[in-house]
Amino acid sequence: MFEISDIFIEEKSVLKEGKELLITDTDKPVISFQLQSDRRETSLRSACIRVNNWIAEVKEQIGIKYEGEPLKPFTRYDVEIEAVDDRGNNSTKCAEFMTGRKRLPWSGKWITDEMHVTEKPNSPRPLYFRRKIHLEKAVEESWIVVTAVGIFD
């Protein structure tokens, strides 16, 4: 058995089950992959990494810098890696990642409530922020990325 057991973009796994889609703003993300074999001392002979039209033939697993066309903001990218070991066994795995805002200017409206929020330890009432929107077309895809200072520390 010889297989690619994980793929990493910017040192973060993109294959582990239950993981959210990885989002990066890096112009040239670093790609790595992990191999697994039931044979001792198995080594990588070569690998081919594809990200859209960019193809890299490599002999290493770690720190391969994407050198293709500039990545566009808010775009999904497929990654395919084919690895061959020292005995000619091969394994192929696919994954995806997405780019974030990158350097686009930010515009939007805050979703907030009318109350002035004061911090209370162990506040029993969670805050809800909602806004109704009306769309002219059907939604094809949507995602939300949320963060705030101190929430995830």
Model-derived regions: residue spans:
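Short, compositionally biased P/S/T/A/G/V-rich stretches that sit at domain boundaries
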Residues: 1-24
